[in-house]
Structures are given as structure tokens and as C-alpha cells.
From Swiss-Prot:
It comes from Homo sapiens (Human). This is Toll-like receptor 3. Changing K812R: Loss of ubiquitination by ZNRF1. Heavily N-glycosylated, except on that part of the surface of the ectodomain that is involved in ligand binding. TLR3 signaling requires a proteolytic cleavage mediated by cathepsins CTSB and CTSH, the cleavage occurs between amino acids 252 and 346. The cleaved form of TLR3 is the predominant form found in endosomes. It is found in: Endoplasmic reticulum membrane; Endosome membrane; Early endosome. One of its GO terms (biological process) is positive regulation of interleukin-12 production. The chain crosses the membrane at residues 705-725. The keyword rRNA processing does not apply.
Length: 904
């Protein structure tokens, strides 16, 4: 029933007038058949939503009931979420009104009892969420009709047992969530209702389970996943659990934080008769892993042992884990005191049994060092993380990784280990290594290049955040395959040596030299790095290099980087930019010049940045944003950052910029608050985007008079030159036109037989293309014959006469339009004009335009007095860029050649 609030209004104190103010549902948002009515303090179900909605969200409201009648209009619902309300009872008729309902979420309500009728009509449900209610006991069989149910969530209730019914049911159930209840024992008679079920996940975490009765798991048809996290099992109950799991279908077993402090060769004995593939023993404070503890788990593939306290890993502790591919030992070996004697130990050959191991995580441990046979036997290891793992790994020698000599290691993480020195041949055993991370250490040395010997397949070396690195010409000579080199904040020295330390890195795509206070760079430092795509040089001191006052002039250290996509030059103190500094950077997409001292930029500095998408110039000293400087850069921009610049709000400085930002779709963060005028004084602090540009229109009489006089003078000069150089041609065309109009010559093209299918008008420079493609079309279609000047003009005939005759003998005229054609004097002055004139005089639609290049209409009109709108669409063709579309182009051309010449 709709709840209403009576609102009584009095007028004059005499005439009462009552009104009913209904609760509003207009705040619900509806999109793509999904209605969101959450967080609206609703006390009843809205009745004005579209009838075709399939998803309805009513969470976080004040609903106490769900009257079935209120859902009559929403019969298409497949998902209903009424969580976080105060519903205490569910009407059985609800699902009768919602026959298509598949997902019902009732979490965080006040349901306490479920009768046999509660879900009797919810036969299509696949998910039922009842977590965080007050259900303490399941009586009879409330879920017996849910034959399609896949997920049932009863977690965070007060259930004291797993009994959910008295007869076999829920045959399609895959996930049963019973965590955070008061279950103390698992009994077969309570679980036998799942005799026909295949449970992929049985979630019993955070219960007080003390007993596993015999056959409790065998009562379930098939059990694949069991989760008992945060259950105080201990070693004894864990052993009993595993015995009960024997001969089941268990695949995944999670025992995180189950107080399993020790393991022995009998702990997991029961799992010998299973095919367990995943075992989670994390957060157990496990300190003793006995020999052969996991010998019964030959099928295990994923093993989680992180956050334990293993004091000694024996040579046979991991025996039997022959198929493990992933092993997580993060923070599993931690010392108990500051005493060196308390450091955890890992025996040699401890990992030799893990023949299939590919991923090993040993981060955040207190291991004394790497022994000569620590990793021996890991013949399939590809990823090894040793970040913050060692207490005394100060120097990497040629013996450090000898135990990995037979491992096909691809990724090695050695960060946060306080490494101070890398000796020659330190990685010579790691020939397959692709990624080497040495960041966040204390390395301080000269890199001779011998450190990387043997890294024949290296792809990335990360050396950022170390003490200092001094480069030499051979620092990277032995790693030509390197594509990513990170040298951020390493107090880089000798970077300006010649030849450049980076010269051998021809395959480099990412180079990070930021935060190094670099002041000197040679113009050949990046020479040869033609594949470089990302260059980070922020937070250095490169200002002098681009000054015109620099001895020898500006240093163009970016030359040749034709494939560079991202350039970061933030915080370098630049106050000048040479006009050609970005000349070669045609593919540049992101430029960051923020936090510098730039004021005036050269007019054409961004002319070649046609691909630019993001430009950052924040916190500079820019006062003027003019079109001649920023126009090319802003053309395809998607993001612009020019915050905190002292803009000069005058017509000359920002009028164009204001018009642009008010019209563009480019993302400009904080436009209203951080783009403020600095000068003149009366505009100080005024938002730039609100600057009135209407006053910038020039209406000075003198300038207007000057423009008019200049225009008249230029027109007069043009006419004089035209008559002087082209007078005879004008006279000739005038006479021809007069003769045509007066009827000196009659032409009836309807009965005339043409010798050529088309006459080709093209620029001289395009003759090779014309010959290649039109002659090949003639060979493919014998009925086609084009008039090609080089082949078909009669010898000895005057060229102009031959052109006129050939056009008359051709049924169509094809213009091959390129920039060369627009500049070809013969084509512009005679061929094109004569062809168009003949088509107009004969009332024919005989011209076909073939565009080999993208030519704007205004250029076409300016050069040839033609526009695309003068021709039918099928007579305008564009040469395709893709070779596979050439056949389609030729087909369209043949259609155009076969079309009627008549305009009507």
C-alpha cells in the first residue's frame, strides 16, 4: 500500500484544504532496461518505472515488505536486488508475479524464518543471496523447488548446522556459502541433501567447526572446492579433515589462518587419494614443515604458503610437489629476533622436486643469502621474485645465480635488497632472462658492460632509484636486444660521453633518464635510436642546451627520433625552445613541458606535430596563446593542460584561444578555476574562458580604408597581368563561345561512335601511375580502350589539336586528380577547361574524377574551377590505400564508364 503524508493547508483560517503528497520515484535512474532506485529512502516499490526493465536495484532503502501486487507491471524482471532494507517476511506470490526472475538478493535484511512456501514459485532462480539476515535454523524444505539454483548464499546468519532440508534437492547447485555462522560439526545426515549436487565451492570459513563426522563429505555428490579459512583446526583436526576428504572429487582446498603451526608426513595423508590441484595454507604462522609433508600431493599445481613463519625448509620439505606450477612464499621466512642465529634457513636442493614450477614468489623475507644450490632443479622456472628477500645480499657475483643455470628464467625481481655492487658475469647463467628489475637498491658503480654478459635475450632492465651509476661507451654494448631501459634517479654520470653509451641499443623503445640533474647532453646522445617511442627526461637541468646563447648554438638532441610517441621534459628550467627542435618528431602524441619557464614560443615550433593528442604546458610563464603558434598543435588535441600560466587578457594575446576553448571538445582540466588572467590589472584573477572577444573586432576606419584600397590595387594589378599574359587565350575562348552559341557547329553525340572509352587527363608526373593501372585494365577487358597521350597521339599533329581531337573521339573524360595536376600549367590552362567546356556545351555527363590524393574542394575549385557537387556521386572515385580494395575501385570505374552521358 502506498504510504502517503496528509498535508493540510489553511487559507484565511476558515477553509481547510487536504492534499496527499505521494512519495516521489522520479529519482530512479533507468538505462538500458536497468533501473537503479538505491539510496532513495523509499518505503515502497515505485510504480512508475518502465514495464520492460529486466534489472531492478532497490538496495539501501527503508522497505519493510515486498507486496507481490507491486511487481505486477514488472513481469520482465530477471534480477531483483532488495538488499540493505528491513524486510522481515517474503510473500510466496512474489515469484508468481516475476516468472522470469533468476537472481534474487535479500542480503542485510531481517528475515528469520523460511517456510516451504517462501520460494515455492521461484523455480527459475539461479542465484539466491540471503547473507546477513537472522536465519538460525532451516525447517523442512524451503529450497526444494529451486532445481536451477547455482549459487546459494547463507553466510553471516546464525545457522548452527548445515542442514538445509530433509530430502535430496538442489541438484544443480554449484556454490554453497555458509561462512560466518555458528556451525560446529559437519555431519553426513545433514549434507546428504546434496547427494546429486556437484559443488564447485563449499564455503565454511569463519565457523567454529570442531568435528568432521565419518563420511560427511561423501554424502555430497561431488565436492570440488572446500574453503575453511579462519577455522581453528590445528594440526590434529587438519589431519582428520584430510582423511575425510579421501576418495572425494576435491580439487581446491583453502585452509588459510587455520592455526596449522606444524606439518608432518601424516598431516595430508588423506589427500593421497584425491586429485587436489590447489592448496592454500597462508596466514597460519606455520613454523615447522617436516620432510615429506606434501609427498601425498603429486597433482598439486597451485600452492599458497605466504605469511607464515617457516624457520627451516629442509631438503625434503617440498618433496612430492612434482606438478606445482605456482608457489607463493611471500613473507614466509621471517626472523624472530635481531640475532643472526634466528635467521630462517633454506637447505640446498630444497626446490629440486618442483620440476614443473614456473612462478615462484619469495618477496619480503629474511633469508641470509643465496646458496650455490638453493634453486637447483627448477628446470621450468620462468618468474622469480626476490624483492626484499635477503638480509645480506650486498654484492652480486658470478656465483650468485649459478643454481639457476638450468632454469629458463624470463623475469627476475631483485628490488629492495640493498644491493650495492654488480660484478662481471653476475647474470651469465641467465641466458633466457627478458626482464631484470634491480630498482630501489643501493648500487653505486661504473657500468663497464661486463655486468650484463650472457643476457642475450634481455628485453627490459630496471635500474631506477639507486645510489649512482657512471656510464661508459660500453655500458650496454653486450645487450643490443634491450628495448626498455629505466635509469630514473640514479645520479647518472658521464651521460654526455662520446660515443654515446646508448648507441648500441638500436632496438630501444623506452628510455627513462628522469630525476638525474643532467645538465650536459651531446647532440648525438640518442643517435641511432630510431625505434624509441617513450623518452622521459623530466626533472633534469637541460635549460642551457636550448638557449641560442649557448656556445655553438642550441643542441638538437632529439633529432632522428621519428617514431617517438611520448616526450616528457617537465621541470628542466627551459625558457627557450628552438624553432626546429621538434622537426623530426612526426609521430609525437604526448608532449610534457610543464613546470618550466617558457614565455614566448616560435611560430612554427609545432608545425610537424600532426599526431599530437596531449600537450602539457602548466606552470610556465606563457602570457599569449596565438593561432600561429598553437594552431597546428591544437588541431587534433584530446587533452590540454595550461594551468597556472600568467595569461595576458588582451585581444592580441588570447582572443583566438578563448574562442577555441569555448568551441573545442578537447579535455581541459580545471578550466574554470586555474586559467586566470594576470594582466591587465582590471582583469587580474578573471577566468580566461569568460573574456569577451566581441570587443576584439576591428572597426577602425583607417584600417578599413587601407584594406579596401589595397584590395582594389591588387585586383587592378591582377587584371593587367592577366590581359598581358593570357589575353590571346581569353580572346580565343570568347570567339569559340560565340560561335557555339550562334550555332556555327551542331553536334549530335547520341548517334556518334567513339573510338575510345575515355580520354585520360593527368599531370606529366603521374604518367607512370596512369600507364600502369589503365593499361592493365585494357588487358583485363578487351572492350576497354583508353586514350593515353604517350601512346595514342598522332605523330606530327600539333599537341593542342591532338588533345581536342582525342577528347572528341572519347566517350568519357577521366581526370586523374593529384597535387601535380593542380600545378600542371597545361592541364590547368587548357585540358581541363576544354573538357569541361565540351561537356557543358553538349549537355553531357561525361566527366569522371579519380582522386589519387585527398584534395579539399576549395583547392580543387581554386586550381581547376571544379567542385565535387558538379558531378554525380558515381562519377567521383577515390584511389584506395589498401591493395585489397583495388578490385572494387576498378569495378566502380567500369560502372562509371558504362553510365549514360546524358544529364537527364
Amino acid at each position: 500500500m502506498r504510504q502517503t503524508l496528509p498535508c493540510i493547508y489553511f487559507w484565511g483560517g476558515l477553509l481547510p484544504f487536504g492534499m496527499l503528497c505521494a512519495s516521489s520515484t522520479t529519482k530512479c535512474t533507468v538505462s538500458h532496461e536497468v533501473a537503479d532506485c538505491s539510496h532513495l529512502k523509499l518505503t515502497q516499490v515505485p510504480d512508475d518505472l518502465p514495464t520492460n526493465i529486466t534489472v531492478l536495484n532497490l538496495t539501501h532503502n527503508q522497505l519493510r515488505r515486498l507486496p507481490a501486487a507491486n511487481f505486477t507491471r514488472y513481469s520482465q524482471l530477471t534480477s531483483l536486488d532488495v538488499g540493505f532494507n528491513t524486510i522481515s517476511k517474503l510473500e510466496p506470490e512474489l515469484c508468481q508475479k516475476l516468472p522470469m526472475l533468476k537472481v534474487l538478493n535479500l542480503q542485510h535484511n531481517e528475515l528469520s524464518q523460511l517456510s516451504d512456501k517462501t520460494f515455492a514459485f521461484c523455480t527459475n532462480l539461479t542465484e539466491l543471496h540471503l547473507m546477513s539476515n537472522s536465519i538460525q535454523k532451516i525447517k523442512n524444505n524451503p529450497f526444494v523447488k529451486q532445481k536451477n539454483l547455482i549459487t546459494l548464499d547463507l553466510s553471516h546468519n546464525g545457522l548452527s548446522s548445515t542442514k538445509l532440508g530433509t530430502q535430496v534437492q538442489l541438484e544443480n547447485l554449484q556454490e554453497l556459502l555458509l561462512s560466518n555462522n555458528k556451525i560446529q560439526a559437519l555431519k553426513s545426515e545433514e549434507l546428504d541433501i546434496f547427494a546429486n549436487s556437484s559443488l564447485k565451492k563449499l564455503e565454511l570459513s569463519s565457523n567454529q567447526i570442531k568435528e568432521f563426522s565419518p563420511g560427511c563429505f561423501h554424502a555430497i555428490g561431488r565436492l570440488f572446492g572446500l574453503f575453511l579459512n579462519n577455522v581453528q583446526l590445528g594440526p590434529s583436526l587438519t589431519e582428520k579433515l584430510c582423511l575425510e576428504l579421501a576418495n572425494t572429487s576435491i580439487r581446491n582446498l583453502s585452509l588459510s589462518n587455520s592455526q596449522l603451526s606444524t606439518t608432518s608426513n601424516t598431516t595430508f595423508l588423506g589427500l593421497k587419494w584425491t586429485n587436489l590441484t590447489m592448496l592454500d595454507l597462508s596466514y597460519n604462522n606455520l613454523n615447522v614443515v617436516g620432510n615429506d609433508s606434501f609427498a601425498w600431493l603429486p597433482q598439486l599445481e597451485y600452492f599458497f604458503l605466504e605469511y607464515n613463519n617457516i624457520q627451516h625448509l629442509f631438503s625434503h620439505s617440498l618433496h612430492g610437489l612434482f606438478n606445482v606450477r605456482y608457489l607463493n612464499l611471500k613473507r614466509s621466512f621471517t626472523k624472530q629476533s635481531i640475532s643472526l642465529a634466528s635467521l630462517p634457513k633454506i637447505d640446498d636442493f630444497s626446490f629440486q622436486w618442483l620440476k614443473c614450477l614456473e612462478h615462484l614468489n619469495m618477496e619480503d623475507n629474511d633469508i641470509p643469502g643465496i646458496k650455490s644450490n638453493m634453486f637447483t632443479g627448477l628446470i621450468n622456472l620462468k618468474y622469480l621474485s626476490l624483492s626484499n628477500s635477503f638480509t645480506s645480499l650486498r654484492t652480486l657475483t658470478n656465483e650468485t645465480f649459478v643454481s639457476l643455470a638450468h632454469s629458463p628464467l624470463h623475469i627476475l625481481n631483485l628490488t629492495k635488497n640493498k644491493i650495492s655492487k654488480i660484478e662481471s658475469d653476475a647474470f651469465s647463467w641467465l641466458g633466457h632472462l627478458e626482464v631484470l628489475d634491480l630498482g630501489l637498491n643501493e648500487i653505486g658503480q661504473e657500468l663497464t658492460g661486463q655486468e650484463w654478459r650472457g643476457l642475450e635475450n634481455i628485453f627490459e632492465i630496471y635500474l631506477s632509484y639507486n645510489k649512482y651509476l657512471q656510464l661508459t661507451r660500453n655500458s650496454f654494448a653486450l645487450v643490443p636486444s634491450l628495448q626498455r631501459l629505466m635509469l630514473r634517479r640514479v645520479a647518472l654520470k658521464n651521460v654526455d660521453s662520446s660515443p654515446s653509451p646508448f648507441q648500441p641499443l638500436r632496438n630501444l623503445t623506452i628510455l627513462d633518464l628522469s630525476n638525474n640533474n643532467i645538465a650536459n647532453i651531446n647532440d648525438d646522445m640518442l643517435e641511432g635510436l630510431e625505434k624509441l617511442e617513450i623518452l622521459d627526461l623530466q626533472h633534469n637541468n637541460l635549460a642551457r642546451l636550448w638557449k641560442h646563447a649557448n656556445p655553438g648554438g642550441p643542441i638538437y638532441f632529439l633529432k632522428g627520433l621519428s617514431h617517438l610517441h611520448i616526450l616528457n621534459l617537465e621541470s628542466n628550467g627551459f625558457d627557450e625552445i628552438p624553432v626546429e627542435v621538434f622537426k623530426d618528431l612526426f609521430e609525437l602524441k604526448i608532449i610534457d613541458l610543464g613546470l618550466n619557464n617558457l614565455n614566448t614560443l616560435p611560430a612554427s615550433v609545432f608545425n610537424n606535430q600532426v599526431s599530437l593528442k596531449s600537450l602539457n604546458l602548466q606552470k610556465n610563464l606563457i602570457t599569449s596563446v596565438e593561432k600561429k603558434v598553437f594552431g597546428p598543435a591544437f588541431r587534433n588535441l584530446t587533452e590540454l593542460d595550461m594551468r597556472f600560466n600568467p595569461f595576458d587578457c588582451t585581444c592580441e594575446s588570447i582572443a583566438w584561444f578563448v574562442n577555441w576553448i569555448n568551441e573545442t571538445h578537447t579535455n581541459i582540466p580545471e578550466l574554470s578555476s586555474h586559467y586566470l588572467c594576470n594582466t591587465p590589472p582590471h582583469y587580474h584573477g578573471f577566468p580566461v574562458r569568460l573574456f569577451d572577444t566581441s570587443s576584439c573586432k576591428d572597426s577602425a576606419p583607417f584600417e578599413l580604408f587601407f584594406m579596401i584600397n589595397t584590395s582594389i590595387l591588387l585586383i587592378f594589378i591582377f587584371i593587367v597581368l592577366l590581359i598581358h599574359f593570357e589575353g590571346w587565350r581569353i580572346s580565343f575562348y570568347w570567339n569559340v563561345s560565340v560561335h557555339r552559341v550562334l550555332g556555327f557547329k551542331e553536334i549530335d553525340r547520341q548517334t556518334e561512335q567513339f573510338e575510345y572509352a575515355a580520354y585520360i587527363i593527368h599531370a606529366y608526373k603521374d604518367k607512370d601511375w596512369v600507364w600502369e593501372h589503365f593499361s592493365s585494365m585494357e588487358k583485363e577487358d578487351q572492350s576497354l580502350k583508353f586514350c593515353l597521350e604517350e601512346r595514342d597521339f598522332e605523330a606530327g599533329v600539333f599537341e593542342l589539336e591532338a588533345i581536342v581531337n582525342s577528347i572528341k573521339r572519347s566517350r568519357k573524360i577521366i581526370f586523374v586528380i593529384t597535387h601535380h595536376l593542380l600545378k600542371d600549367p597545361l592541364c590547368k590552362r587548357f585540358k581541363v577547361h576544354h573538357a569541361v567546356q565540351q561537356a557543358i556545351e553538349q549537355n553531357l555527363d561525361s566527366i569522371i574524377l579519380v582522386f589519387l590524393e585527398e584534395i579539399p574542394d576549395y583547392k580543387l575549385n581554386h586550381a581547376l574551377c571544379l567542385r565535387r557537387g558538379m558531378f554525380k556521386s558515381h562519377c567521383i572515385l577515390n584511389w584506395p590505400v589498401q591493395k585489397e580494395r583495388i578490385g572494387a575501385f576498378r569495378h566502380k570505374l567500369q560502372v562509371a564508364l558504362g553510365s549514360k552521358n546524358s544529364v537527364h
